[in-house]
């Protein structure tokens, strides 16, 4: 019989200053209204690259906003907010509406005991998808439907950013939208515009590869 001992720590890619280090961090534990999940897939967001390079500057600049970044960039951070995960266990006060083993995506936020919102993947106490496990809010979960593979499900967060931008634009239907920058979010904007039947869609990017992807996603003029 094989004995497996888990010493209450998980492996993770940890941001330590301007570098990423593979190491171990304490296992996260779900609080009231939260659940524990296992990371299945996690994407690398452009914001993660900016954070790795300029965490201190981002932290200082965030103080000028209504939602300052509540983290200490001098301490360990486990990034990753574009993920698909599997439910492992529930904390107290949860509805348990999804079975253990269900695949989920989520808005990357958690609520601390004092009611303050923390960004999963950008806080010192809520590790993101670069770790083996995460704590998520049950109320912010989205179940992955059958037939959608895990890799594609992990694109839910960046796709939602693009869809939200189109929703905020409140287009009447006769506008000609221009999408400048055809990275993942720009492509998500193009896809959302196409789904709404808005067009013609103009897209611009320096990269020939991204311009090609923009055309595949439904842009009319590149």
Region annotations inferred by a language model:
Residues 15, 42-45:
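Disulfide-bonded cysteines in secreted/extracellular proteins and peptides
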Residues 6-13:
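Short structural boundary motif marking the start of a folded domain
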Residues 148-222:
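Mid-domain Rossmann-like dinucleotide-binding core that forms the NAD(H)/NADP(H) cofactor-binding site
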Residues 12, 22-24, 36, 84-86, ...:
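Conserved hydrophobic/aromatic beta-strand scaffold that supports enzyme active sites
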Residues 50-58:
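Short Gly/aromatic-enriched secondary-structure transition segments
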């Amino acid at each position: 019989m094989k004995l497996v001992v888990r010493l209450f720590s998980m492996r993770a890619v940890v941001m330590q200053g301007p570098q990423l280090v593979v190491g171990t961090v304490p296992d996260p534990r779900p609080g009231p209204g939260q659940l524990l999940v296992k990371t299945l897939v996690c994407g690398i967001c452009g914001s993660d690259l900016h954070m790795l390079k300029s965490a201190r500057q981002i932290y200082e600049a965030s103080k000028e906003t209504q939602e300052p970044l509540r983290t200490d960039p001098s301490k360990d951070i486990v990034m990753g907010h574009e993920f698909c995960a599997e439910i492992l266990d529930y904390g107290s006060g949860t509805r348990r509406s999804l079975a253990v083993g269900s695949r989920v995506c989520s808005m990357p936020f958690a609520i601390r005991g004092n009611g303050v919102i923390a960004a999963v993947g950008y806080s010192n106490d809520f590790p993101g998808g670069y770790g083996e496990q995460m704590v998520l809010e049950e109320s912010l979960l989205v179940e992955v439907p059958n037939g959608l593979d895990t890799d594609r499900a992990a694109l839910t967060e960046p796709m939602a950013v693009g869809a939200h931008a189109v929703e905020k634009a409140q287009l009447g239907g006769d506008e000609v939208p221009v999408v400048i920058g055809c990275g993942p979010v720009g492509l998500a904007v193009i896809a959302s515009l196409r789904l709404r039947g808005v067009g013609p869609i103009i897209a611009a990017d320096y990269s020939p590869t991204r311009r090609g992807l923009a055309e595949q996603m439904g842009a009319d003029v590149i």
